[in-house]
Amino acid sequence: MAKPELEFFDPIVVASMPWVPVPGYPEGIHEKILAIDPPTGPWRHKTRFLRFQPGVETKETFVHDYWEEVYLIEGILIDVGKNQTFKAGMYCCRPPGMKHGPYKIPFGAMAYEVHYYLK
């Protein structure tokens, strides 16, 4: 199975979708899922907005078995492990196994993310 087929829809619909706490993440991190392929599990084949409240810090280094693309819409993410700061307008494409984080988000941030597997 794949993600559902979705034609363009009104941004008011997206704006009215709830921000939901991300299971397993620290408090202050919320997601708005646009599309998901449920059989692949909660972390895979997903398109979402991710919002970080000011002052959020993650504790772990992240490594996963799927591809992840991230476009930072607003704010700043500080990758403590790499000692790098990422700003709004920056983009990354992470292959499976790429380490990233932990993060500090001093002023809040929002990102657009796509998670997927390639065979």
What are these regions (language model features)?
Residues M1-R44:
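A short, N-terminal "cap"/entry segment at the start of jelly-roll beta-barrel domains
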Residues K32-H64, N83-T85, P95-K99:
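Conserved short histidine dyad/triad with adjacent acidic residue
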Residues W67:
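Alpha/beta-hydrolase fold active-site loops
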Residues E74-G75:
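Glycine-centered positions in the ABC transporter ATPase nucleotide-binding domain
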Residues P96-K119:
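Ligand-binding loop in jelly-roll beta-barrel domains
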